[in-house]
Amino acid sequence: MAKSRKMLNAFELENSIRELAEYISVYGISCSFFSNVSGEISAEKTIALFKFIGIFIRHIMNCTDALLFNLKVNERFIDLKINCDSKNEMKISDDLLDDIIKLGGNVTTEYDADTLFVFVRMQSGGDDI
């Protein structure tokens, strides 16, 4: 559906991440999701962000017992924060970042006191927004 439209309601991304958080909890990982979304966002950026989350989760599933997602979307930006309990510092590979960076997004990571913090920010609209 996303590939056939240029813009999506931000609630579609919110609901997708919420369902993913519920699915992760089935595997014994404490997973919380908070959001504040409004407006429409680029379908291409939605796909890239959800792909990023999926690959990230696959990498950390076996080395965490708690995840926190915080999604904020408004007419200008998509901000995603992920906090992950992890005894091992995880480096996010360049290929995982490629789709986000190609779309003008920024990803930063910090590791402190057994917690990995991931911050993703990108414009919410298309290339001209």
Task: Describe each PLM feature range.
Residues 1-27:
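Short beta-to-alpha transition helix within the HATPase_c
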Residues 20-32, 40, 67-72:
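Conserved NTPase motor "head" modules and their coupling/switch loops across ABC/AAA+ ATPases, GTPases
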Residues 28-55, 76-78:
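Conserved short strand/loop->alpha-helix "switch" segment adjacent to the catalytic nucleotide/phosphoryl-transfer site
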Residues 43-70, 95-96, 100:
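Conserved ATP-binding N-box helix of the HATPase_c
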Residues 54, 58, 88-119:
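ATP phosphate-binding glycine-rich loop and adjacent ATP-lid/helix-beta elements
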Residues 68-78, 111-112:
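Short beta-strand/loop element within the Bergerat-fold HATPase_c
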Residues 119-126:
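C-terminal beta-strand of the catalytic ATP-binding
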